[in-house]
Amino acid sequence: ENPNGLILGTPGSGKSFAAKREMTNAFLITDDDIIICDPEAEYFSLVQRLGGQVIRLSPAGKGMDGKPQYVNPMDINLNYSEDDNPLALKSDFILSLCELVIGGKEGLQPVEKTVIDRAVRNVYRPFLADPDPAKMPILGDLYNELLKQPEPEATRIAAALELYVSGSLNVFNHRTNVELSNRLVCFDIKQLGKQLKKLGMLIVQDQVWNRVTVNRAEKKACLLYT
C-alpha cells in the first residue's frame, strides 16, 4: 500500500473539513501519533479540543499564550536502532539546513560540505560523551565552531548563519522548551513569514523524522498532515 495521500478540491469544497475528520478518526480509533504542519493556522482549535500540543513558531518566539516557544534544530535523538547512526543523520540534516540558508542554484560545494560535517562532529562530541538535555548544542555553537575552522569557506558559511544566530531571525537559536512527546502535535508556522517559513518546515520535518524513528522500534505509526 502507498502510505501517502492527497485531499484535492476547489476552494470551499471542504478539504480542511475532510482532513480534520480524518485526523479525528485516527485519534479516536487508533493509537497512531499525529503531527500537523499547519501553514494557515487552521487546526489549532481541533488539536486543543483533543488535548494535543500546539506549537506556534514565529519570529518573536512566542506561543499562543504569549510565553516563549522554541524548537531547536540541533536536537539530536539518540534512540535510534543499531543500524542507524544518529550523528550521521543529524549531519545530513544540518547540511540541508545550511544549503537552504546559503541559497544559490548550485548548492553547497564539496569543501563546504566537508567543513560543515567536521564542525557538526566537533560540536556534538562533548554532548555524546555526556548526553545532558540542558547541554544540547544550538545553532550558535555550530556558528562558533565554524569560525574556528581554517578554511575561508567556513567563514562564508558562518556569515550566512549569523542572521539566524544573533540577527533578527534568531528564533531557532534556542534549546527546545516545548513538549514534543504528545501524541497529537500541531506546528503552527503561519507567522514565520517568507524568510523563515522554508526553514521552519525543514525543522518540522526533522522533528517528524525523530518521532518516526522512535515509533518504528515500537511498531507504532506516525501520521503527518501538511
Each language-model region and where it sits:
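P-loop NTPase motor domains
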Residues: E1, F44-Q53, L57-K67, N72-L224
